[in-house]
Amino acid sequence: MIMHRSDQALAIRALRSAAPYIRMYKGKTFVVKAGGGVFADPQATRSLVEQIAILHHFGVRVVLVHGGGPQLTELAEALGVPTRLVDGRRITDQRSIDVTAMVLNGLINTRVLGMCRDLNIEAVGISGVDAGLVRAHKRAPVRLTADGELIDFGFVGDIDTVDTTVLRKLLDNGLMPVVSPLSADESGTLLNINADTVAAAIGAALQAEKLILCTGAPGILGSIDDPRSLISYTDLNGLKRLREEGRIAAGMLPKAKAIEDAIRGGVRRVHVVSYQSAEGILGEVFTNEGTGTLIVADVNALTPAEQQSTP
């Protein structure tokens, strides 16, 4: 590839700027969660995996957790299986759990592994069922709606424990786990778990340096319909205020809960970035300005410089 001198200078400046972060994060663990939306777009998928490949080759221990909601809905409709979501969470009956396994463990996981092979990432596809990675129980019916309707989520699980043994063995051997959020109870009954929830639990169990949530939005927005209202950083109290004010709703609700769980579980920093940006992850991790939203336990722990431009 021929590079003009101006481009060479720009690339060198970028490397120099990123060098402190590369040194800082070498050997650290990042959990990256990508929703099914990214996998509906081959170019977005490639861009995401290319960025993860760079992290991997820089020595970051990456665990990739993927969703598959749009693909699951599409296949369910094609098979005549009805879809219902409550507060951003899918109700999963017996037919739906079969479709879920087909999409998550079969379609999405395998496609990601194929992309990893193309980009020279040694990756291994697993689910929460494998080696008892995610142990869960079937969620009891709960009242969530405004009218007090009792909601039975069906074959949806709530996490009991995360056993990171298999993840650590893979990471210690230079392999990148690609995790489907499917789990099972102690009797082996398959359970669907929100991918944000699984990513947060894995991040906490690994005491990850970062949890990175890749979404269709540029980050957390002050105004849901205005992408220019990006919030550069906030903390748990700020997140709570946004939820109380109704500025976090629908599909962002599980993400907000996952962010809180991850930080309270020991993850230092959570980032919400856009998968639609070709440099969403790298720009967030390796620049002072960032590209999305940083969430920490308490913004007062950030330095003034960090509060102006946060890596």
Positions of the model-derived regions?
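Nucleotide/pyrophosphate-binding catalytic subdomain
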Residues: 1-277, 282-283, 289, 297-311
